[in-house]
């Protein structure tokens, strides 16, 4: 698609093809109350000095409070924290009530059981269209060793679960759990005894192996689901 006028929905979907981590940005308002919201446009910037960056929509709740704060924190959610992401993506009045959290050295809320957290001083706020880029200088951080939650094409996924599934299939058997729909009738994939097809996985990508075997059976295989919606 060319030109600089795009269908916003199509552009958003294209951006969404890039898998990201899921974070909750937090800070305190002038009265000391915690504020925060979910964001996935996050990246490291520099080791020396230690800088990171997060993009915030100008329509975000608490946008003014967040961008005016002297300090803010980034909570990188772990694989088990999909519910936290959903809570902080919604306009709930007291989102912090359902989360186990504490104050970082400069007072920013940090969550328990996250993959990592960073508390930052505000280094710069850069205008960028309908967003701003908040650049933070890291003043404190901690990494728990837990795996981070992933997000792509509108769905959450757990990288370690996907890796274990691929690893398990690589040395054993893989199978199809699906049905075909033809003229409003459903047909299980399998033999006449209605068992599901299974194939030996000697190595390589299990999904590609399964697709190849099914195509040999005369089936057209496309649109493989690559995300695990937990």
Swiss-Prot record:
GO molecular function, one term: riboflavin reductase (NADPH) activity
EC number from the UniProt entry: 1.5.1.-
SMART domains with a match to the protein in the record: Flavin_Reduct
InterPro entries in UniProt: Flavin_Rdtase-like_dom (IPR002563), NADH-dep_flavin_reductase (IPR050268), Split_barrel_FMN-bd (IPR012349)
One Pfam short name: Flavin_Reduct
Highest taxon, organism lineage: Bacteria
SUPFAM superfamilies, A to Z: FMN-binding split barrel
UniProt record similarity statement: Belongs to the non-flavoprotein flavin reductase family.
Name listed for the protein in its UniProt record: Stachydrine N-demethylase reductase subunit Stc3
């Amino acid at each position: 698609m060319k030109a600089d006028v795009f269908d916003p929905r199509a552009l958003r979907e294209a951006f969404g093809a890039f898998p990201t981590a899921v974070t909750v940005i937090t800070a305190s308002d002038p009265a000391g109350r915690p504020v925060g919201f979910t964001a996935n446009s996050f990246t490291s910037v520099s080791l020396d000095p230690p800088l990171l960056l997060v993009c915030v929509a100008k329509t975000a709740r608490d946008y003014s409070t967040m961008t005016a704060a002297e300090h803010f924190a980034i909570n990188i959610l772990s694989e088990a924290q999909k519910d936290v992401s959903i809570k902080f993506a919604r306009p709930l009045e007291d989102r912090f009530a359902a989360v186990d959290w504490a104050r970082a050295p400069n007072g920013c809320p940090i969550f328990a059981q996250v993959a990592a957290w960073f508390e930052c001083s505000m280094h710069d706020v850069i205008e960028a269209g309908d967003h701003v880029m908040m650049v933070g200088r890291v003043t404190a951080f901690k990494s728990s060793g837990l795996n981070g939650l992933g997000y792509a094409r509108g769905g959450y996924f757990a990288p370690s679960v996907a890796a274990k599934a691929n690893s398990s299939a690589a040395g054993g058997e893989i199978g199809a759990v699906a049905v075909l729909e033809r003229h409003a009738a459903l047909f299980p994939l399998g033999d006449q005894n209605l068992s599901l097809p299974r194939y030996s996985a000697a190595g390589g990508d299990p999904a590609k192996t399964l697709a190849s075997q099914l195509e040999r059976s005369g089936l057209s295989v496309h649109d493989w689901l690559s995300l695990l919606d937990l």
